[in-house]
Regions:
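Short, conserved catalytic or adaptor-binding loops enriched in Gly and charged residues
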Residues: 36-39, 67-71, 134-143
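PIN/NYN-family metal-dependent endoribonuclease catalytic core
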Residues: 6-61, 72, 147-150
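Short, solvent-exposed polar/charged micro-motifs at secondary-structure junctions
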Residues: 54-59, 87-91, 155-157
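Amphipathic alpha-helical interface surfaces
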Residues: 30, 51, 63-66, 84, ...
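Active-site neighborhoods of divalent-metal-dependent phosphate/nucleic-acid chemistry enzymes
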Residues: 76-127
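Short acidic-hydrophobic, aromatic-tinged amphipathic segments that line or gate anion-handling sites
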Residues: 75-80, 145-149
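Acidic, PIN/NYN-like endoribonuclease modules and their adjacent C-terminal/linker elements
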Residues: 1-2, 18-25, 94, 111-157
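A short alpha-helix capping/helix-coil boundary motif
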Residues: 12-14, 45, 65-68, 82-86
Length: 157
């Protein structure tokens, strides 16, 4: 069975960040391992309207083109519906997650993701962040887990 994962925009952009910092380099390496798993069919990636929107806002044409190429590997798209907007509001209000991040999380839950991967500490390490959002996911019939790509690779690859 294929595992469904949702990659936050910052994961797709990690290869273009300053690689002199250990954490950024490790997250980039983890992303490369995940990409290989996607190409081999082990993982199915979700995309969403909020993800597409954020990618259109990438200023560098080269970076945007490369990220769009990564995104083209996605096999499943979550259409923005009222249920996603409502769930995003619940996540924002209950868990203290920023609007766009809450919409990413809501799309991942609605799309049946097993994991939501992000490099954003505000999502993974916030006082109420991951645990709260995972509880909301559970309430909506999802066992989705939220973690950094490095942790995901250590657990699942």
């Amino acid at each position: 069975m294929h595992m469904i994962i949702y990659l936050d925009t910052n994961v797709y952009c990690r290869p273009f960040d300053n690689q002199t910092q250990d954490r950024i380099r490790e997250e980039t390496d983890a992303f490369e391992v995940i990409l290989e798993g996607i190409r081999k069919g082990r993982f199915i990636t979700l995309t969403s309207d909020v993800l597409q929107y954020e990618i259109t806002k990438i200023l560098s044409p080269l970076k945007r083109t490369e990220v769009e190429r990564y995104l083209a590997l996605s096999k499943k798209r979550v259409e923005e519906k009222e249920e996603i907007l409502k769930l995003g509001i619940v996540i924002r209000d209950r868990c203290g997650i920023k609007d766009r991040d809450a919409l990413h999380l809501a799309a991942a839950i609605a799309g049946g993701a097993t994991y939501f991967l992000t490099c954003d500490d505000g999502v993974t390490l916030a006082t109420k962040g991951a645990g709260c959002t995972e509880k909301v996911a559970e309430e909506h019939g999802s066992g989705m887990k939220i973690c950094n790509p490095i942790i995901f690779v250590k657990k699942e690859v």
